[in-house]
Amino acid sequence: MPNQGEDCYFFFYSTCTKGDSCPFRHCEAAIGNETVCTLWQEGRCFRQVCRFRHMEIDKKRSEIPCYWENQPTGCQKLNCAFHHNRGRYVDGLFLPPSKTVLPTVPESPEEEVKASQLSVQQNKLSVQSNPSPQLRSVMKVESSENVPSPTHPPVVINAADDDEDDDDQFSEEGDETKTPTLQPTPEVHNGLRVTSVRKPAVNIKQGECLNFGIKTLEEIKSKKMKEKSKKQGEGSSGVSSLLLHPEPVPGPEKENVRTVVRTVTLSTKQGEEPLVRLSLTERLGKRKFSAGGDSDPPLKRSLAQRLGKKVEAPETNIDKTPKKAQVSKSLKERLGMSADPDNEDATDKVNKVGEIHVKTLEEILLERASQKRGELQTKLKTEGPSKTDDSTSGARSSSTIRIKTFSEVLAEKKHRQQEAERQKSKKDTTCIKLKIDSEIKKTVVLPPIVASRGQSEEPAGKTKSMQEVHIKTLEEIKLEKALRVQQSSESSTSSPSQHEATPGARRLLRITKRTGMKEEKNLQEGNEVDSQSSIRTEAKEASGETTGVDITKIQVKRCETMREKHMQKQQEREKSVLTPLRGDVASCNTQVAEKPVLTAVPGITRHLTKRLPTKSSQKVEVETSGIGDSLLNVKCAAQTLEKRGKAKPKVNVKPSVVKVVSSPKLAPKRKAVEMHAAVIAAVKPLSSSSVLQEPPAKKAAVAVVPLVSEDKSVTVPEAENPRDSLVLPPTQSSSDSSPPEVSGPSSSQMSMKTRRLSSASTGKPPLSVEDDFEKLIWEISGGKLEAEIDLDPGKDEDDLLLELSEMIDS
């Protein structure tokens, strides 16, 4: 109809995006209708809504099955014109299956078979990159011969065996040169060579014609695996009796019959039978068996030879139509239709004594591997005995080259690193040795021979231990600690005896503590604190080594601990040497301190009131006067101090940097601050104020200030407590006035005083109560706090906090 035209193709079959502007007809009633409107064909359809299609049918879509119906999602089209066998749901609507019946065009079975055969052959050819010679011969014969299909069900021929390539080469030569001699059947000589020479037919009884099984993919794979394992292990002994009993598989798969026939070459020449039999027996290297009677066909005899078994066959069915018998026999024989053709493969392969020896893939791989091995043995004679010949599997034999494992490589790397670190540590220890010897020469003047000998013996022992990287046990560490404590106590016995001779001398010694802190600290802390720190570092070493921490770290730590020990021992020796000069040093230090002398006295008095609460304040005055008297020997002490300053740049004598500690101790102190933030928490405000009061000093010194000031904040209240109980007017006034008056040096000196208090308490045998309390504190801190916090056991936390807040306010 001219005004409406024909139906819009896109609207009819999918969706038209033009909408109203589309010149073609959009009629929803006609969608999916496969009946052409006859009036429209005549050009006189005037209906507004015509249910029939105004479009010629180029295909009969209702007779074509819908492609999408067989897809996982199914057909989702409401107006799908194609044929649907099943009902479907589209947008919640149920659409019934198509009413039209698909016309089944009766195809001739030959055509069906041809179609299926073509698809199978295409699969084979696609799997094999180049068609095997058998298939080539098949293609030649196919055009010339027309063979009737046999009566038995189809057989799946697995032409794409991966390991058949070398056999194909063999068969190629054979097919071209002596085609008749290679065929095992007497009646049919040219045919049915589909996969390889090794796959002959096995079915024996003609009565079992209908019992050919179609193998599934799993069966084929499992047989391949069996075949490989038998080749490696059993050889010919694995031939099972299943060869003679094929499994009957029911199934009307008739379309594959032509597959067999097409991929087979048949020849009906009869003249070559004896030749074939002779060549077959020669090839297999077996005697002929007289199997059954003379009426047995020659096929059976060749089978008996091949399998080495007596075969009894029925005497019927021999006189069937010759062609069919030939076809079935040749099929059975050539295509290997038994249940286990691979077993026969194995025997065949083992017993092959052919004129042309075809190497299998395994043999080739073995040869290559042996060649490689020969080359490698010249290079790697050391590894020769460890290599083993994997003659069973070709894949394994090629990997006989010794490859280092990851762990071996790691071990080698570690070994190299260890050696490098040992060399470094040797250098380090020799450097340390030289430095220490030179320092001893500078500083130790009185007994140089003894000291230098002791020092030089120690580093030598240390270098040995470092070279051997010996992991110490806990018992060894304890023994070493005990020895060290003994040595240090012996070295320091002379000086404490001098100190304890008179109380005045002892007081003077305590005054030196403010600036010449190094001597006394090392003297009194040497026994406990130093041994603790060294034990701690050694324990760390031991744990690090045992837990498998990298050896470089251990050696670095060991170097540090060695340096610490050397410095400690040297300081102890200096200390023992310089004990006669203590008084001079004290006077020198007080003179250097200049202004802070006033504040030093209250600190000392506080300490004395704590330690000796029953003593009167007269002794304090004696002490201060003693300071004035000892100003004569300042020059000598100053010279010795200067010498020490040259030898050790880290030690600074000025009061502004009184906090200087020997460098190895800085790290443990920082650790103590970090690990015991909870202990220090209550003290934080005072510590910050003291840091603000500090003059700008060296960074190393500043790092230690918080801990020092915290010690002060805890120890000052207990020093004030006896001051309140014992009325000492001069001390009180001076100490009260000291915080506002003194700026930087005073605070630092007070901090050094508190440090001295704690160390002195460790050096001297304390009171029993104090001892218990210090033990408790030591347990709480886990042995990490080096300067133990002295607290008065009579006070509880609230009193201490109150006094702290009062101090902060003042």
Curated annotation (Swiss-Prot):
The modification Phosphoserine is found at S108, S132, S149, S171, S290, S370. Residues 391-402, 749-762 have a biased composition (Polar residues). There is a cross-link at K114, K124, K140, K478, K619 (Glycyl lysine isopeptide (Lys-Gly) (interchain with G-Cter in SUMO2)). Gene3D superfamilies: 3.30.1370.210. It comes from the Eukaryota. The keyword Cytoplasm does not apply. Induction: By heat shock treatment. The modification Phosphothreonine is found at T321. A zinc finger (C3H1-type) spans 2-29, 31-57, 60-86. Residues 160-175 have a biased composition (Acidic residues). Residues 486-498, 729-748 have a biased composition (Low complexity). The keyword Zinc applies. GO terms for molecular function: RNA binding; zinc ion binding. Residues 309-322, 367-390, 417-432 have a biased composition (Basic and acidic residues). GO terms for biological process: poly(A)+ mRNA export from nucleus. Interacts with TREX complex components THOC2, DDX39 and POLDIP3; the interactions are ATP-dependent. Interacts with PABPN1; this interaction retains ZC3H11A in nuclear speckles. Interacts with KPNA3. Through its association with TREX complex components, may participate in the export and post-transcriptional coordination of selected mRNA transcripts, including those required to maintain the metabolic processes in embryonic cells. Binds RNA. (Microbial infection) Plays a role in efficient growth of several nuclear-replicating viruses such as HIV-1, influenza virus or herpes simplex virus 1/HHV-1. Required for efficient viral mRNA export. May be required for proper polyadenylation of adenovirus type 5/HAdV-5 capsid mRNA. This is Zinc finger CCCH domain-containing protein 11A. It comes from Homo sapiens. The gene is ZC3H11A.
